[in-house]
A protein has these predicted regions:
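Short S/T/G/P-rich N-terminal loop/turn motif that feeds into the first structured element of a domain
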Residues: 1-73, 77-103
């Protein structure tokens, strides 16, 4: 069962959102969560970010829980609000040769 974790994060300011995002660019996101099959962060507003991590199964997702917690703890001063949701991926349809890749 493919499993996803979704983090909705509201940062204290736009500049702190920039700082938050910069902590995950240039492959850092992948270094922190190498078990994830898909990692995506979406800037949903000037000071908000939604991140989605997709794993092969819940067991794999659960195996990185402590790492996720310590990563968030290290960025705690930037965060105004954080909501975590998770669940079974029901549809995953990636267009073949879409050109979408690592940014």
């Amino acid at each position: 069962m493919t499993f996803a974790r979704i983090n909705n994060v509201e940062l204290n300011s736009e500049s702190e959102a920039d700082t938050f995002i910069s902590n995950f660019t240039s492959g850092k996101f992948r270094e922190i969560f190498p078990e994830a099959e898909i990692l995506i962060s979406i800037r949903t507003g000037p000071s908000s970010v939604t991140s989605v991590s997709v794993y092969k199964n819940k067991k794999t997702a659960d195996s990185v829980a402590d790492r996720r917690k310590s990563t968030i703890e290290g960025l705690k001063s930037l965060i105004k609000y954080l909501a975590l949701t998770e669940g079974k991926v029901e549809i995953l349809d990636l267009k073949k040769d879409s050109g979408v890749g690592t940014f």
